[in-house]
Regions:
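Structural detector for short beta-strands of small beta-barrel domains
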Residues: 1-11
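Canonical P-loop GTPase G-domain recognition
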Residues: 117-168
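SH3/SH3-like beta-barrel fold
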Residues: 15-19, 26, 47, 57
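Helix-rich effector regions associated with P-loop NTPase G domains
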Residues: 13, 36-51, 61-78, 83, ...
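Beta-strand/loop nucleic-acid-binding surfaces
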Residues: 23-38
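Histidine-anchored nucleotide/phosphate-binding helix
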Residues: 92-107
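Short, Lys/Arg- and Gly-enriched loop/turn segments at beta-strand edges
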Residues: 52-60, 88-90
Length: 293
């Protein structure tokens, strides 16, 4: 007997598939491994039922999108949780995460946490940063009760992936979304300024009328697969400005509309500086590869 469903959890080689409200524990057919294909949480699949009420994933239906961090498929929103204190706010890490999501063409929501730990001047500066991301088209929330209620309206009947820096408060944020869940939370290591990786696997939790996946935290991200020439297209506000010479990488070129926008404060300086750092890293990465050949 064949059924269709969605993978809600992947753990130790087992896939937990929701088939019209029934959770079926499945293994993947060996041909997936032979073809180097891995079923992902969020995949819509066909399963073949076994006699003991378990099953085998026999087909993965076409994905509408796929994220690398977290490793999930077919999501409606990607929520990026960002700490502004303990660990310190990292614009570079935020912008790298945004690049990964933009590259997968996924709707992005940014959650800023721990604003209560900031002093007045720090808070005003952070509000300006938050407003900038809102102005360039991202949905921006805090972890306040009021914002959580607004967020629930946005993600109603949706599948959502949540990611962020270790210690940013992802699990705590999910527990605020639904008090009946009790996801393990870890204390911040004061010595490292990083959180413990309390989430060990990827799983969609049903909360009210939506599903949300919490995944292992991270302190760094790998975007080696993105070409340096493509980075500019992942910084969405750059599209609004014209440059005299095309193609323009917005680095050393003259009469560059993006650089002029930075100087006139239309583009957030820290965001452009992060772009330059990422571009240079990609450039050095390619030079190292050529040298090693």
């Amino acid at each position: 007997m064949t059924k269709e469903g969605k993978i809600l959890k992947a753990l130790s080689g087992f896939y937990y598939v929701n088939c019209s409200g029934e959770i079926v524990t499945c293994r993947a057919r060996g041909n997936f491994r032979n073809e180097n294909i891995t079923p992902l949480v969020g995949d819509d699949v066909k399963i073949q039922m076994s006699d003991n009420n378990t099953g085998y994933v026999v087909e993965i239906l076409e994905r509408k999108n796929e994220l690398l961090r977290p490793k999930v498929a077919n999501i409606d929103y990607s929520i990026i949780v960002v700490s502004v204190k303990d660990p310190e706010f990292s614009s570079k890490l935020l912008n790298k995460t945004i690049c990964l999501n933009e590259n997968s063409d996924v709707n992005i929501i940014i959650i800023f946490t721990k604003l209560d730990l900031l002093k007045d001047a720090e808070l005003e500066n952070m509000k300006e940063i938050m407003n900038y991301y809102y102005e360039i088209g991202y949905q921006v929330f805090t972890n306040s009760e009021e914002d959580i209620d607004k967020l629930k309206e946005v993600i109603s009947n949706k599948y959502v992936a949540i990611s962020g820096q270790s210690g940013a408060g992802k699990s705590t944020f999910i527990n605020k979304l639904a008090e009946h869940l009790d996801i393990e939370t870890g204390e911040i290591s004061k010595h490292l300024g990083r959180g413990r990786h309390t989430t060990r696997h990827t799983e969609f939790y049903q909360i009210d009328d939506f599903y949300i996946a919490d995944t292992p935290g991270f302190s760094s991200l790998d975007i080696t697969f993105i070409e340096k020439e493509d980075l500019q297209y992942l910084f969405r506000e750059f599209h609004d400005y014209d440059c005299k010479f095309k193609p323009c990488n917005h680095m050393e070129e003259i009469q560059c509309g993006v650089k002029e926008a930075v100087e006139s404060k239309q583009i957030l300086e820290s965001r452009y500086e992060d772009y330059k750092v990422l571009f240079t890293e990609k450039q050095n990465q390619k030079r190292k590869y050529i040298k090693e050949r």
